[in-house]
Curated annotation (Swiss-Prot):
The gene is argS. Its main location: cytoplasm. GO terms for cellular component: cytoplasm. It comes from Nitrosospira multiformis (strain ATCC 25196 / NCIMB 11849 / C 71). PROSITE patterns: AA_TRNA_LIGASE_I. GO terms for molecular function: arginine-tRNA ligase activity; ATP binding. The lineage of its organism: Bacteria, Pseudomonadati, Pseudomonadota, Betaproteobacteria, Nitrosomonadales. This is Arginine--tRNA ligase.
Amino acid sequence: MIPPVQPDFKSHFTDILRNALNERGLADLNLDIEFARPRQSSHGDYSCNLAMQLAKPLRQKPRDIAQSLATAFSASPYLEKVEIAGAGFINLFLTTSAKQQFSRYVLESGEKFGHSSMGAGEKIQVEFVSANPTGPLHVGHGRGAAFGASLANVLAAAGYSVTREYYINDAGRQMDILALSTWLRYLELNGVASAFPPNAYQGEYVRDMARLIHKAHAGRYVHEPELLFDRVAGAEADTEAALDGLIANAKKLLGQDYAYIHNFVLNEQLGDCRNDLMEFGVTFDIWFSEQSLFDSGGVAQAVHLLEEGNYLYQQDGAKWFRSSHFGDEKDRVVQRENGQFTYFASDIAYHLNKFSRGFDRVIDIWGADHHGYISRVKGAMQALALDPEKLEIALVQFAVLYRDGKKVPMSTRAGEFVTLRELRQEVGTDAARFFYVLRKSDQHLDFDLDLAKSQSTDNPVYYVQYAHARVCSVLEQWGEDPGMLVTADTSALTGAAELSLLQKLIDYPETVEAAAREFSPHLIAFYLKELAGEFHSYYNSTRFLVPEMTVRLARLALVAAVRQVLNNGLKLLGVSAPAKM
């Protein structure tokens, strides 16, 4: 009988090689010891190329070095054999007993299986979604939300101390456009007809907010609307200058009442956003207001620091940041000639604020259209004497919806978009969360609505959840306490399918760490699909409630462990694990 099963075989084997290097006086080489999973089972369960890394500094043949290092594994109780292959690969073969006992370790660990201390408590802030509160969240925001929430969960499982943050863009021009759009619809309800700018916000939600204001205040905010279009050239044209003119006039006409309209639409949209995300299973520790950076003087302070460092210059009355010195294609304005700070200026202040809060690393999750923004933000960090390497950017490509094989059109300003809420109502939260992370975040995602709604094995989320439900059904038929399976004798798990399933369970903790290290929660989704596939094959070819008690309990322990891993993985992705389907 071998000792209690090692939860992390790779760490165990890494320690063996690290000790071997120390004994040989080679610790100073500080080499990365990595174990890979061979593509062919005939090459073992783990393979290491350390001998080839040592060949040059030791001036020896890799195979000779590998032969020497292989002797260090003789004391491991988890290895059946060690082979040297090719130019000097060290291939390790786990004992059948080590694999068999792993299902018991999974059951003992429960919901903590797959968690590790890799992050060692490192403080990481993950900022994601951060959509302008100018309308309902749409399906593009949904992908960023699903990715960000899943990544934060994965990082936490890997031992990092994670803070989830939403940056509220409540100080920008887009909020003024929404306030203007709502006021114009409000005027219509008061019998004041006017040309509605084609580049204002067109959605029905704007009319809904106007109705709420009208219901509460009737005609209180009808202030000389006939003057709204005064001195606004081409007010009916689709030009930004015309829109700015209307906003300026609205502020003058409404006076202090403009703040009410502005704050009302902000609070309405922000409240809707919070509720929408909560229903999507996405929550935040901090909601950070952009306006607070202006109110506290943070934006002015950040610009002042850049000016002190000689990173700004004046041109045409505006202040420019020398971002081209940091790899940007051109310099960027931080303060316009009229004294107003740009969005870039508040973004600099926001990142300065982030690092002042003591995070070891900051992860920004942006839409892929912000790719060009990376160099200027990192440049500003460097100019402020902050380490730009501690700021990491994960880009998320837009999700394109397809219904009946046809692309669904999207335009936020024109009010032509599918909201995240509508998507959830159509396909369900589980399907949406899972489909959003099926691919790497920076890859385009075609979201097939018909597939997401189907109850077939072609639907990946259904396929994975059905595997979980099948295990629940087997255990329910058994009728005993699953807790007793923790002590089951698993030596009867000798079939090829069983050993393959056990190896798949062994791979789960490594998959979680890889997903955390590479910012790739899609690795969890891939893993779950593969695990479900192996389980379904095993289920279709195996009887579980057999008369022989040892075999029965061993198989039940195995599938119970599969259920636990499916549950744990789905939880990281924000997807439920139903007991019945």
